[in-house]
From Swiss-Prot:
<feature type="coiled-coil region">
    <location>
        <begin position="25"/>
        <end position="77"/>
    </location>
</feature>
<protein>
    <recommendedName>
        <fullName>UPF0478 protein YtxG</fullName>
    </recommendedName>
</protein>
<dbReference type="Pfam" id="PF06103">
    <property type="entry name" value="DUF948"/>
</dbReference>
<keyword id="KW-0472">Membrane</keyword>
<keyword id="KW-0812">Transmembrane</keyword>
<dbReference type="GO" id="GO:0016020">
    <property type="term" value="C:membrane"/>
</dbReference>
<keyword id="KW-1133">Transmembrane helix</keyword>
<comment type="similarity">
    <text>Belongs to the UPF0478 family.</text>
</comment>
<feature type="transmembrane region" description="Helical">
    <location>
        <begin position="1"/>
        <end position="21"/>
    </location>
</feature>
<keyword id="KW-0175">Coiled coil</keyword>
<dbReference type="InterPro" id="IPR009293">
    <property type="entry name" value="UPF0478"/>
</dbReference>
Length: 140
């Protein structure tokens, strides 16, 4: 019976030894995996610093670009207002020209008889003058 006890203790010792060996291998494998994870995280940390720097630079450039666009937009607004002023001036000029043309047209209509008389008298004067020139020529 003691032999069974010794055999049982020996079997327990062997089982414990096997357990310790496999546990040791597992822990070494875990240690290697954790070292790989640590080196990967260090590389990732370096990449994140680079990305953070680039992101900050990009954000600054974007802000400068937005400010530049804002300034140019304000300048363009002044140009648009100036063009609107020119458009209003041209419209007023057109209105004045239409009124002047209307006044001239009304004046011509009112004085049509007088204009016809002036044209008739002018033609008569021209005919008299032409005849006088011809008489003068024939007299020479």
């Amino acid at each position: 019976m003691i032999i069974i006890l010794y055999l049982s203790v020996a079997l327990i010792a062997v089982a414990f030894l096997v357990l310790v060996i496999y546990l040791s291998k597992t822990l070494k494998s875990l240690q290697l995996t954790l070292k790989n994870v640590a080196s990967t995280l260090e590389g990732l940390e370096g990449q994140m610093k680079g990305i953070t720097t680039e992101t900050a630079e990009l954000l600054h450039k974007t802000n400068r670009l937005a400010e530049d666009i804002q300034e140019k937009s304000e300048k363009l607004n002044t140009v648009v207002h100036a063009v609107q002023g020119v458009g209003a001036s041209v419209q007023q000029f057109n209105t004045s020209m239409k009124q002047a043309a209307g006044s001239v047209s009304a004046s011509v209509r009112e004085n049509q008889d007088k204009i016809n008389q002036v044209v008739t008298w002018s033609q008569a004067a021209m005919e008299i003058w032409e005849k006088w020139k011809q008489k003068k020529k024939s007299a020479l």
